[in-house]
Every structure is written in C-alpha cells, then in structure tokens.
Amino acid sequence: MDDFTGLLARDFGLKPQGKSAPMASQSNSSAADFNTFASSYSFASAAGKKSDSLPVFDDLGRDGDDLLFRDVFSGPPPKYGSSGDSRSPSAPAFDYDVMFKEPKSKSASSMPVYDKPVYDDEDVFESIPELKIPSTSSQSARFENVFSSISSSPTKHRKQNSSPFDDLMGNNLGKKESDREEKGSSIFDDLIPGFGRTSSPPAKRTTSETTSQSQKPPYRTAETSSNVKEDPFVVLEESTSTLREPSTGGFTDPLEEIGKFNSRKTDHSSVHGGVFVDTDPLDSLGKSGPDMNSRGKSHLRPPGNISGSQSPVESSGLYHSKNVSFDDVVEPQNTSTPPPTNSDGSFESSDDVWLTVSEIPLFTQPTSAPPPTRPPPPRPTRPIKKKVNEPSIPTSAYHSHVPSSGRASVNSPTASQMDELDDFSIGRNQTAANGYPDPSSGEDSDVFSTAAASAAAMKDAMDKAEAKFRHAKERREKESLKASRSREGDHTENYDSRERELREKQVRLDRERAEREAEMEKTQAREREEREREQKRIERERERLLARQAVERATREARERAATEAHAKVQRAAVGKVTDARERAERAAVQRAHAEARERAAAGAREKAEKAAAEARERANAEVREKEAKVRAERAAVERAAAEARGRAAAQAKAKQQQENNNDLDSFFNSVSRPSSVPRQRTNPPDPFQDSWNKGGSFESSRPSSRVPSGPTENLRKASSATNIVDDLSSIFGAPASQSGGFQDVDGETEERRRARLERHQRTQERAAKALAEKNERDLQVQREQAEKDRIGGTLDVEIRRWGAGKEGNLRALLSTLQYVLWPECGWQPVSLTDLITGASVKKVYRKATLCIHPDKVQQKGANLQQKYIAEKVFDMLKEAWNKFNSEELF
C-alpha cells in the first residue's frame, strides 16, 4: 500500500504551506502517525462539545458524543481536558480499548486522552477578517485536524510533531519554506478565503436542518462564536451515524461562511444569490455510512485518492445525508470532481459521499512494528445502481487502481496502514437512511463489466468538477470582495496567494485528470486486450476440448463396436459349438435309443424264445412221459396176455400130448420113412396181441425181436421127436415175444443176461426220445427267430433304407458311411472317402467290412437278433455293390 507522502500533491495538487514536511522523517513510526491521523480526522467535530458557547445548530441532546459514536465502536471516545497537557510521542493517539467498549456513564470521562492537538488556536478561516473569532480558553482543547499541519501557522508547525498529513500535499503545495515562514499564514490562506484560521470544533445540526437546509440559515448569529465553522475535512463523520441517531456535526463550507458572515440577518436564498437555493450536492451525506464487511472494506473508494483523503463518491441514491448546500463542498477538501451546473444555472443534486478518516475505524490493536511491505491484493468492484435522472459516477472507476508516475516513491508503512484503513472503511454498512438496501451487497459482477462505463462516468465527473470549481471560484471572488472591506490588509496578500495556488491547482488537476484519463484508457485497452486474449484462449481450449472429446468419443465408439463384434463372434462360436454338441448329443441319443430299442427287442425276443423253448421242452417231456406210461401199460397188458396164452398153450399141450401118446405107434412106424431133421409143417396159432402191437408202430425193435424165437424153433426141428414138442412150445411162446417189439423175457435166460438186455433196450429208447426232442426244439427255435425278424424288420428296414438311399451300388459311399448304421460294439472304424480313391483301397476296406459284418462272424461273436438282422441286410447290400464295382472297375 502507498503512504500519504505526496499523495495529494500528486493527485490533487495540494501542497502544505508550512515548513518542509516533517512527516518524511517519521516514515518509520507509521503506527503512531496513523493513530494521530485517525484521531484528528475522526473526532475533530467533537473538540468543542464542552465549551460554554452554544452550538451552531440545534443539538438533539446535550451529550452529543453518545449520538455521534453510538454506532461507531460502541460509544464515544474520551474527551480532552481543557488543560494543555500533551502525551508522550510513544503513546498511541487512538485509544482502541475505549472505542471497542460500551459507552460509560455521563459523569465519567468517556473520551480518550489523545495527544495534545497541535495548533489548537489556529482556525481554518483565520485568513478571513470577518470570521476571525477570538477563542477562549475552553476552546483551546480541540481534536487535531487531519490537515493541522496545513492549516496551522508555521511557527507552531516547527514546535511539535505534525500529523501524518504534513507531507500529504507534497512539499507544502509547492511553496518554498521561506515563503511560508515570511507570510506566516495557514496552508489554505491563498486557496480559499478564510480557510486557515482557527475555528471552533464543528457543531451539531438539528434534524430540521438535515431535512430542509434551504429554509434555515446553516449557522446562527454571531453570538455562537465558538461553533461558527466546522472543519471542512470532518464532513463524513456525520455519515458514520445511521438512521438510529441524527448526525452529530454540521458540514460547513468556508466559502459559505463568508457569505453568511457578510449578511447574517439575510435570508439563505439571498446569501446564495438565488442560485443554490434548492441544490444540495451532498443531499444524502450524513444519513448513512457505507456498510462494513468482515474485513472492514467498503464497496466505495474515492477516485484517484488512495491515501484516504476526502473525495466524492457516488452512492447511487443509497447515501442520503443531511441537506448541505453547495458551499459545503469546496476545493480545500481535495474535491477534484465538482458537480456540473444545469441549464437554469443551478447545480443538480449529487449523491457524492465524502469519505473521511473518521469513517475508517481500526479493529486491530495499534503497534509500532512496521506493516508488511507486500502490496495489497486488488479488490473486486461492484456496480452501484444509479438514481433516476441523476448523473452518477460508477464505483468501478474509483476502485480501479490507476498507476501514476509518482506511485513508485510512495511505499512507506504509513501509507500501507492508511490503504488498509481505506479498504476497511469501504466495507461499512451501506444501508441508507430511507431504508433502501445496498444493491452492491447482493449482486456480483465481473471486474471488467463496467470498464467502459467507468471511463464515461469519470469524464462526466471531471466535467462536473470543472463546472463546480469555476462556480466556486466566481463565488469565492465575489465573497472575497465583500469580505475584503472589513478585513485587515495582511489578509489580502494571503487571499492573492490562495488564488494563485488555486489556479495552479486547477492547472495541475487538469493535467492530472488528462493523465488519469489517458492511463485509464490505456488500462481499459489493456484490459480489453487481456479479455480478448483470455476469450480467445478460452475458445481455443474449448475447441481443443471439443476435439479431444470427439476423438475420445470416436475411439470409445470404435472400441465399443469392436467389443460388440468380438462378443457377437464369441456368441456365434459358442452357439455353433453348442449346436454341434447338441447335434452330436442328439445323434448319440438317437443311436442310444435305437440300440436300447434293439436291445429291448432282442431281449424280448430272447425271452419269448426261451419261454417258447421251455414250453416246448415241457410239452416234449410230457409227451415222452405219456408215451412211456403207455408203453408200460401196453407191456403189462402184453405180459398178462402172454401169461394167459402160455397157460392155455400148456393146457392144449397136455391135451395134445395125450392124444399123441395114442398115436405113438403111428409115429413109431412112420419115423423110418421121414427124417427127423426136417421139421414138420405146423400152423402156429394166431396171437391175439400181434396185430395190435404191429399196428401201434411204437417200437421198431419188434422186427428183430421176431427173429429171436427162430433159433429155438430150428433147434426143435433138428431134435428128436421128444424135443420137437418142446420146440413147438418154444415157438408158440416165442412168436408173440418177437411180435410185441418190447422187452421180452426169454425162457431159460439167466437173470444177468436178461438185466443187461433190458438196460440196453432202455438206453436205446432214451436216445431216440432225446434226438426227437432236440429236433423239435430246433424247429421251434427257427420258427421263433423268423417271427422276431419279421417283427423288428419293420423298424430296422426304415433305418437301413434311409442309410442306403442314393448309395445303391456305390461301394465307396456305403463303406464311408458304414459307421452310421452299425452298432458301436461291432468294431468297425470309420473310413474317409479320400482313403477310397483307388480300387485296391476299396477292395481292402471291403474285405475288412466283410469280416466285420458277416452273419456267421456276428453269430460267433454272440450278437443279438437285431444285430444279426442288421448284419445280414448290410452284408447283402455290400455284396451287391461289390459285384457291381468288380464288374465296372479294373484293379
């Protein structure tokens, strides 16, 4: 931050008239200087509150300090004593402990004990003869003015350390120290008539005066000698109070005092010459101070004045102070922008706010340590709404930090503290007295949004300031002529010097205004260029971002498409695999179903065949048993019949023997004529059982058995006549035995021989029955197999025909697809068509197939009926194809 050294001289052309700036040597003691400045600048209006003289205006209360400081730091500061005691230079001039506490009782001293004000007996209007008022002892203790070093006499300026504003005007307004010492006048003797004399502290103003200043004279009669004039730089201490309290001091103009003292009994309109009757450029001043934010910075900042000096700031209808005439705003207060005049010769009402140090309170404890040397950060500006039909100066023009040529040398700690104080004061409460809220507190605008408007508003403000300055100059000339008649001669020279300084100041202001405008234009051009560059950079970044996003989007889409295609391929492959597996599974299931069906059919056929064989065996066994029983019954019957026949034959033989005995003589005599070896021809008696036996045909052995008794018959023929009878009997009994075909007992046969012959006969019968049963079983089995083949042929023929469709006579096709019709257990290995190109390979594969599916081979391997049927059919088809192949191809 910049210090105050030379700041007014650089920006406004004001230079002190006293000795050379004593502040230059006190740059290190910045804290003490700032405290002195704050105390002198804030509480100058309260210096004469306890004087015996009456205030200029109607006070709202006897204790005006409470009203003045009730909103500021929680109560009024303690007052000076009337005695001329002075504090040590090391003690701070601003008692913060007292300011931040609640106000105390009336009886106790509530004002802080400041350093003894310098040049208490000097008046800012000392050079005006008519306003020179003798000061009493009660008026000696006053608050130190901000420009005490300017307004005080050079002699006193040497005696005591001045305020930090000694060097504020820059080499004492450009005048030499010798000139100031010779003239011995105040700093503003040549600037404004009467602006250098010692005056009493500012007096309070009534509420009526704040509302209608044009109807009442701003000052009372001459009897209020102690409170006739106010310090022109303490005007904004009245704006520190809000609507809750009236303003505590009147803001008067030295030029206005000139006219008022020349014609005290005249009307207010006659004093102003009918020009400024209804015009109050500071109409809203004193009603409300700017809002303070958390950092103590206001939204308003004086234009071109970083040192914290007074300057008009547009409040846009939010700062409605008490009605003060145009004379209250004068150039000794560094007003570089006077309001312009309208067409009818009167000034327009202005909402300019005069910021003073009294409105810049400190919330930090004072310290003697130097502040940090780093520059402050730039503050964002906030536009303020304009009042309707009133010209305004945007605050952005005041907030802009305009660089100047003299800024480089202003870097002392005192200026840094004052800049912080200025920033802190800008953030105060901006709620107007009429209840309008601060428009800047609720809206945020861009830093560069009001740059163009700021330049135009600044130019308008400069034009108004020029018009105001010219009018003030004319008024001062007229008032000075009136006042010069009753003034002393030495004031004329001071007035001329002030006029010269005023003209020089005007020239400097014009030059500085032109420089500021040029710098502002350059700054605006730079800002526009920076904004354009920033906009271009943002556009380029946006284009790059869009291009990058497009590339990323295209890449992402390509990746998504590739992933989708890969996923689709994988899905298709998986579906193909699943389909193949399903088809294979279906084929295997069909084959298994066919095999199971074939097995079930074979098992059923086998069961049926076994059942039929068992039934056939049972039937055969039953028949054999029946036949054997019948044979045994017949044999028993034959034996009984034979026994009966033998009995009858024996009886007949006996009868015949007796008869033959009677004829022995005949046989005796006839024996010589017929040899005994020739048997006699006899007629054998018929056997009643012979026909039935031969008709049965059950025994084939009946034929050979019929020849058995031939032997004994022949023997009987050869025997003698005695033996012939026996032979005849044997033949009689042997004939039936040979005729029966069963086992017959032979007379004279031993028991062993008879048993052996019976066993042999039984074995023969058993073998014959067994052979017959086997033959019958084979025939039955063949019949069952044929029936089963006929049954399963309906199912298997369909598959075989489907397999051989289109392959009739094509041996290669049949051999390459043979695995689809054969069962897995046959041992056939699939063969590809590429292996069946040559005739030799076809012949070789055909031989293998023949060995695998030949019906006899299949029968030997224990195949079932279904497999046998398939083998027979396939073998027949292969044989036909082989015959065709063998006839067509040579190999």
UniProtKB/Swiss-Prot annotation:
Compositionally biased residues, Polar residues: 208-227, 392-417
Gene3D superfamilies on file: DnaJ domain
Protein name: Auxilin-related protein 2
Ranges in coiled-coil conformation: 454-666, 749-793
Positions of the J domain: 826-891
Family annotation (InterPro entries): J_dom_sf
Keywords annotated in UniProt: Chaperone, Coiled coil, Cytoplasm
Protein origin, superkingdom: Eukaryota
Residues covered by the R domain: 606-627
Composition bias type Pro residues, residue spans: 368-381
UniProt biased composition (Low complexity): 648-660, 667-680, 696-712
The keyword Chaperone is assigned to this record: yes
Chaperone is among the record's keywords: yes
Cellular location(s): Cytoplasm
Ranges annotated as biased composition (Basic and acidic residues): 174-184, 460-538, 555-568, 579-647, 751-764
GO cellular component: cell plate; cytosol; plasma membrane
A GO biological-process term: negative regulation of growth
Region spans: Disordered: 68-94, 148-538, 555-720, 732-764
Cited function: Promotes probably uncoating of clathrin-coated vesicles.
